[in-house]
Amino acid sequence: MAKLKTRRGAAKRFKATANGFKRKQAFKRHILTKKSAKRIRQLRGCVMVHVSDVASVRRMCPYI
C-alpha cells in the first residue's frame, strides 16, 4: 500500500495533543481596529478542534 501524503497546509495549522488537535483562533490577523479589546483578548491562544472536525484533520494529517 502506498504511503499517504500529508496536506502541508493542514500540518502547519494543527498540533496533535493527548486529547485531540489544537489550533489557533481565527479572526485575529487583520482589521483589528474595529474589534474591541475584549474580543481581541478572547481570541488569544489556542483552542481544541471540534469533535465533528477531528476526522477531517486526521485524514489530512495521517502522521501527526
Swiss-Prot record:
UniProt GO MF annotations: structural constituent of ribosome
GO terms, biological process: translation
Keywords, in A-Z order: Ribonucleoprotein, Ribosomal protein
Claim: DNA damage is one of the keywords in the record: no
InterPro entries associated with the record: Ribosomal_bL35, Ribosomal_bL35-like, Ribosomal_bL35_CS, Ribosomal_bL35_sf
Cellular component aspect of the GO annotation: cytosolic large ribosomal subunit
Keyword Glycoprotein: no
Domain of life assignment: Bacteria
Similarity comment: Belongs to the bacterial ribosomal protein bL35 family.
Protein's name in the database: Large ribosomal subunit protein bL35
Gene source species: Acinetobacter baumannii (strain AB0057)
